[in-house]
């Protein structure tokens, strides 16, 4: 009998160890890991350099909050800024938290402009997380079911409806950001047309909005680093 909450549809397999792209279950069966922990084990399993780095750090410090300067954070942030073309980095615990931060940035941006009730345009088939705020920004009815009331302030449009996006922005002066996945990952791997993304950036520049890309799934390397291949760079 399991004492875990039944909130996951678990498969009847329990893994024992992994090496590179391979996994072995407790019975010794070998599997090619095409899931990568839902796109987070981007360097594979038991990479010797990573194992050494984790063991070395664990022997020194496990955690020492962000009240203090952390040299390794600074080093990694510098590399991320160098390779991404963005200006600053916020480290957090999950993709959900990253998207919550993006939503907060957009709202704070709106408040700084004197907008009391900031609105964010999101896409109907995107997935941004399972917290109340990120769930409210997610259009999949099967994910949203049973968790209302939702956080207000999100406006859904079809991912190909650039004219619809422009119309909303022109009619609703509370819009502060357009938030989207360059590759929609929840219902299949569906890239958004580059002309649409270019148009979104033009709308954002024209109306002083934030263009925010959620690459928690597609940005960890499985399908390249999408924003680096886009015709424009996001603000967030």
List each language-model region with its residue ranges.
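Active-site-adjacent loop/helix segments that line or gate small-molecule/cofactor pockets in enzymes
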Residues: 1-19, 36
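Glycine-rich loop-to-alpha-helix module at the N-terminal edge of alpha/beta enzyme cores
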Residues: 2, 30-115
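Short, acidic, Ser/Thr-enriched surface-loop or helix-capping motifs
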Residues: 25-26
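Short, small-residue-enriched loops and turns at beta-alpha junctions
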Residues: 40-42, 185-188, 218-220
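PLP-dependent aspartate aminotransferase-fold enzymes
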Residues: 77-176
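Short acidic, glycine-rich surface-loop motifs adjacent to enzyme active sites
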Residues: 175-189
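Catalytic PLP-binding core of fold-type I/II PLP enzymes
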Residues: 190-223
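Conserved small/polar residues in nucleotide/adenosyl-binding loops
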Residues: 226-232
């Amino acid at each position: 009998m399991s004492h875990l909450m039944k909130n996951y549809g678990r498969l009847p397999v329990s893994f024992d160890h992994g090496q590179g792209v391979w996994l072995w279950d407790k019975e010794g069966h070998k599997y090619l890991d095409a899931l990568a922990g839902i796109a987070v084990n981007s360097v594979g399993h038991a990479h010797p350099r990573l194992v050494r780095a984790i063991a070395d750090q664990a022997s020194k410090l496990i955690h020492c909050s962000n009240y203090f300067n952390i040299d390794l954070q600074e080093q990694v942030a510098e590399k991320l800024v160098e390779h991404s073309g963005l200006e600053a980095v916020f480290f957090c615990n999950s993709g959900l938290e990253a998207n919550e931060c993006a939503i907060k940035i957009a709202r704070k941006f709106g408040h700084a402009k004197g907008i009391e009730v900031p609105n964010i345009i999101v896409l109907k088939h995107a997935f941004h997380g399972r917290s109340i705020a990120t769930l409210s920004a997610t259009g999949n009815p099967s994910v949203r079911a049973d968790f209302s009331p939702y956080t207000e302030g999100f406006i859904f449009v079809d991912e190909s409806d650039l004219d619809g996006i422009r119309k909303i922005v022109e009619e609703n002066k509370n819009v502060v950001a357009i938030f989207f996945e360059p590759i929609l990952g929840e219902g299949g791997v569906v890239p958004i047309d580059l002309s649409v993304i270019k148009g979104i950036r033009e709308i954002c520049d024209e109306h002083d909005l934030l263009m925010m890309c959620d690459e928690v799934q597609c940005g960890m390397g499985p399908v390249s680093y999408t924003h680096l291949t886009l015709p424009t760079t996001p603000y967030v």
